[in-house]
A protein has these predicted regions:
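Active-site region of the double-stranded beta-helix
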Residues: 1-67, 78-154
Length: 154
């Protein structure tokens, strides 16, 4: 299974077969090759050690019949079946209806606020297009730093 994240926490109930399961903390997201507005990574095989990015902190286990695994929201994860498997995921509806910009069947569609923010950033970026590159970089990095500080200040 591809490397992806879900916006809602879920429980994976493993019923039959065995599979490797790998999960990364949300702090690794910028190192895992997620394109903007994508909940799936471009890493082709997250279980290939040659493709593992530097500086990530994966946790890995092997799931067997009867195992139950809690997967927190926004934790990138992937599964690799070692034989034919059956599993069931149950998602926690922790977000209000309308949290995403469209229908979210699988619990991995980005938040509407994020999509709106990406649109706003695009508009802001256009305002800097005519500046010399040094000034553009200087002020856009200042804005990025301010935005990062807002995220940590809550």
């Amino acid at each position: 299974m591809w490397l992806h994240f879900d916006v809602m926490a879920n429980i994976l109930c493993h019923i039959r077969g065995t599979k490797r399961f790998k999960v990364y903390p949300p702090t690794d997201i910028t190192k895992l090759s997620f394109l903007p507005s994508a909940s799936s990574s471009t890493i082709e095989n997250p279980f290939d050690p040659e493709l593992e990015p530097d500086g990530v902190h994966p946790m890995e286990t092997v799931l067997k019949p009867g195992d139950v695994l809690f997967i927190p929201e926004l934790w990138p994860h992937a599964a690799y079946p070692l034989e034919p498997c059956v599993a069931v995921n149950v998602f926690f509806k922790s977000l209000e209806h309308g949290y995403s910009s469209g229908k979210d069947v699988y619990g991995n569609k980005d938040l509407a606020a994020y999509e709106k923010g990406r649109t706003m950033i695009g508009r802001i970026s256009k305002g800097f297009e005519r500046l010399p590159s040094a000034a553009r970089r200087f002020y856009m990095e200042r804005l990025a730093d301010e935005l990062a500080n807002m995220a940590t200040d809550g």
